[in-house]
């Protein structure tokens, strides 16, 4: 593996693409009532949004880098053939990558805030700095603590759905005349509700996948004394939690489709619910092998991607 390929693998380029897709679809699909309202300046400039997207991508990429830096010993046990830190990049090089990506992410985020929010740019800056600190804390300590690490990762992914909406609301709050012109559009449309629903969906699906990944990494986590859900509660209880969580997601999908009457996405959401139900049922008979959990992790990632793509039809 050459160093360029290794770097893209280190920053989890597929996950970064998914985050970028989430942000773009929230901005263009879920915010479509503001695009169509005909009010000049109803949304922040495309440049400011693009810079915000790049900023978040860099900060999340930095989070993946520092995670692998702290996980060297665990990865030597769980996936020695995929080891990057200490094998392809030295620990010093890895720390340099982390610092550069973090600094670039914060600076680009600040520029985005200045362009769109003027004097309120510090709010975006503070949010991005908090996210950076949260991802670092996760890798250095919280990852090894019961449930906390799973929640931090789930929050970080869900934040990619929530951030474009927050960015637009901050922009409008700083432009009172524009806000007064689009207030009725915001109130009458389901825009804000849909953003919250997709944020919750991203959080729950990521939480499920993180629990499954903990089961996949059971061997290495035990050796490094991590207190993950499968270690503390055991595989059987973990499977029960997964099944109940999947059923909860299915009920929420069907409920929100019914309440909002989003007919364009109805078929998509029902199909997703049925697939998730099959997944829940199969967990009852799941063999205790890492490869099986890896397959479930991939399935959950595909389901999340389908959920993101469904924004196009809302």
Please give the residue ranges for each predicted region.
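Multi-pass alpha-helical membrane architecture of UbiA-family
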Residues: 1-314
């Amino acid at each position: 593996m050459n160093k360029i390929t290794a770097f893209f693998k280190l920053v989890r380029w597929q996950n970064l693409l998914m985050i970028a897709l989430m942000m773009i679809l929230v901005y263009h699909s879920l915010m479509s009532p503001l695009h169509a309202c005909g009010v000049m300046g109803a949304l922040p400039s495309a440049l400011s949004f693009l810079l915000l997207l790049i900023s978040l991508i860099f900060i999340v990429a930095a989070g993946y880098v520092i995670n692998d830096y702290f996980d060297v010993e665990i990865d030597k046990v769980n996936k020695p053939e995929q080891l990057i830190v200490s094998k392809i990049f030295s620990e010093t090089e890895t720390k340099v990558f982390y610092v550069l990506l973090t600094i670039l992410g914060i600076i680009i985020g600040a520029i985005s805030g200045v362009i769109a929010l003027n004097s309120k740019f510090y709010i975006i800056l503070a949010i991005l700095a908090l996210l950076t600190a949260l991802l670092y804390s996760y890798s250095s300590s919280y990852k090894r603590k019961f449930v906390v690490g799973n929640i931090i990762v789930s929050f970080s992914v869900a934040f990619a759905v929530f951030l474009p909406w927050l960015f637009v609301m901050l922009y409008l709050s700083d432009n009172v005349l524009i806000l007064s012109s689009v207030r009725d559009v915001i109130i009458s449309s389901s825009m804000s509700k849909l953003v919250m629903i997709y944020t919750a969906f991203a959080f729950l699906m990521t939480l499920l996948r993180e629990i499954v990944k903990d089961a996949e990494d059971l061997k290495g986590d035990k050796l490094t004394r991590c207190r993950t859900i499968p270690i503390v509660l055991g595989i059987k209880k973990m499977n029960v939690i997964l099944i109940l969580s999947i059923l909860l997601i299915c009920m929420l999908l069907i409920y929100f489709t019914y309440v909002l009457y989003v007919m364009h996405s109805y078929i998509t959401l029902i199909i997703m619910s049925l697939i998730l139900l099959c997944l829940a049922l199969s967990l009852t008979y799941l063999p205790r092998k890492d490869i099986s959990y890896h397959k479930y992790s991939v399935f959950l990632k595909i389901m999340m991607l389908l959920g993101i793509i469904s924004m196009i039809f809302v």
